[in-house]
Every structure is written in C-alpha cells, then in structure tokens.
Design a protein with these regions (language model features):
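Hydrophobic packing residues within well-ordered alpha-helices of enzyme cores
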Residues: 8, 12, 33-36, 71-75, ...
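Rossmann-like NAD(P)(H) cofactor-binding subdomain of soluble oxidoreductases
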Residues: 24, 30, 40, 49-124
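Small-residue helix-packing motif on alpha-helices
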Residues: 23, 33, 52, 68, ...
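NAD(P)-dependent Rossmann-like dehydrogenase/reductase catalytic/cofactor-binding core
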Residues: 195-250
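Short acidic-hydrophobic, aromatic-tinged amphipathic segments that line or gate anion-handling sites
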Residues: 44-51, 148-150
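NAD(P)+-binding Rossmann beta1-loop-alpha1 motif at the extreme N-terminus of oxidoreductases
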Residues: 1-47, 55, 119, 181-183
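Short pre-catalytic strand/loop immediately N-terminal to key active-site residues, enriched for Gly-Thr
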Residues: 106-107, 155-160, 212-217
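Internal alpha-helical scaffold of NAD(P)-dependent oxidoreductase catalytic cores
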Residues: 94-105, 121-158, 169-207
C-alpha cells in the first residue's frame, strides 16, 4: 500500500474483474492501510505479508528491489500461485532463485505513476504462464490504462519510454508553463492549455495511427510561427536531448 502498491490496489478495487472482498493489502504502515480501507471498506488489510499471501491466487509484490529477496523468501509461495513483481530491475532468473517453486507462473509488471489516474502505460512480461493467465492479467491491468505484453529483454528500453518517459513529458510541461508565465499567462491557465494540448497530440497519433511527423507537417506552414519554434528547438538540441535521456535511463 505504498505509492505504487496503493495505486494498484485502488485500481483493482475500482475495476470490475475482482471483488473488493477478494483483495487483501499488506503494509507496515497502519496509517496507509487505514486510509485505503476508508476508501474501499470491502478490502482486507494487514501488516503481515505472509497473511496476505497465504491462500491467494495472485500475489502482487510492489516493494523496492532491495526488499524482494527477503520478502519472497519469507512468503514461500506455492507453484499454483501466480506471482506479479512490480520491482524494477529484478529479472525472472532472480525471482526464480527467491521462490520455493521456480516453475510457478510469473509476471513482471512495469506501470507508470499515471496508474493512480487509471491512465498508466503498463508493460507486462511473462514466464511459465499459459494463454489464459496472460489474457486475464492483461485484462486486469487494462482497467488501469493501456497494457502491452513484451519480451523480458525489451523491458529496460520500454521502461525508459514509459516509466521514465512520463517524467520527461512532465518536464516539458513544466518548461512550457514557465514560458507561458513569462509571456503573461496565469500558471493555472498555462498548465491547462499545455495538458490539453498533450492530450490532443496523443489522440491525433493514436486515433489516426499516424506518425508524429505527419501531424507536425499539418501545423508547420511555410514562414509560420510553428516552424520557427521547431527550428529553435532543434538549434538547441531538443531531439538529441530526448534520445540521450531515454538511452541514459535504460
């Protein structure tokens, strides 16, 4: 019930595939658990990881990577259970070393912080799973945004675009807000303008299945203000900076 774990628990409770009464959440912080329980009275809460995992069909571990080994060794998960790890950087091979039954079905889940708004771009990798399990997990997390099943060896690159990438998008929002304020706009108005522009840009490429350059060409008239701004971005290394940031995050 930490930041990411709490967001996932809330998403599950809001969704239609799992009843609140089938959700049990563990966290050492009584305050966080009580807050979650107040929002969703139907769920169960505990400060015992073992109690939460015992008898569960699906166990979601949303703990820091350095806590994964001790937590998993304590749980002694059974082969019939499904493990979902949200710990970044912990491979399936490592997870297999931490469990009693390395043949158990495992998923690695990489959401981003927008999962709290049910708008996450969530990456999923699978090991020792069948089609039915894959489909259920994808359906489950599609209620919290968009889900993509990818090979484990693509997780690092994809994480740079999604989990890290959302911070880079917000950095652009922050910079654009500063520009708007300098030009005389109120901060709240500037933020709303930029946020809606981002939603619109995403809709253009998603709904029309077009390349960004196609949509850019539609607004860059010869001698116009947009092409002047784009050229200024490139003069200052905008594209190069984005690529370097993504590669640095891999």
């Amino acid at each position: 019930a930490g930041n990411m774990g709490g967001s996932i628990a809330r998403g599950l409770a809001k969704g239609s595939l799992i009843d609140d009464s089938d959700i049990i959440v563990s966290n050492p912080s009584a305050g966080k658990l009580e807050k979650l329980k107040k929002e969703f009275p139907g769920i169960s809460i505990t400060n015992s990881n073992v109690e939460a995992a015992t008898g569960a069909d699906i166990v979601i571990l949303a703990v820091k990577p350095w806590f994964m080994e001790p937590v998993m060794r304590e749980l002694k998960l059974k082969s019939k259970q499904i493990l979902i790890s949200v710990a970044a950087g912990i491979s399936f091979e490592e997870l297999a070393h931490y469990v009693v039954a390395p043949e158990m079905a495992m998923f690695r889940l990489i959401p981003n912080t927008a999962i709290s708004e049910l708008e996450s771009m969530t990456l999923v990798a699978a090991r020792n799973t069948n089609d039915e399990q894959d489909k259920f997990i994808l359906r489950l997390f599609s209620e919290m945004g968009t889900v993509m099943l990818i090979p484990e060896d693509k997780i690092a690159a994809a994480t740079a675009l999604t989990s890290c990438g959302i911070a880079y998008v917000l950095k652009y929002v922050q910079a654009a807000m500063q520009a708007g304020i300098e030009m005389g706009l109120r901060p709240k108005d500037a933020m709303q303008m930029i946020a809606q522009s981002l939603k619109g840009a995403a809709a253009l490429i998603q709904n029309n299945d077009t390349h960004p350059s196609v949509e850019i060409d539609k607004v860059t008239t010869p001698g116009g203000i947009t092409i002047k701004g784009i050229n200024e971005l490139e003069h200052n290394g905008f594209t190069s900076a984005i690529i370097k940031a993504m590669k640095a995050s891999k």
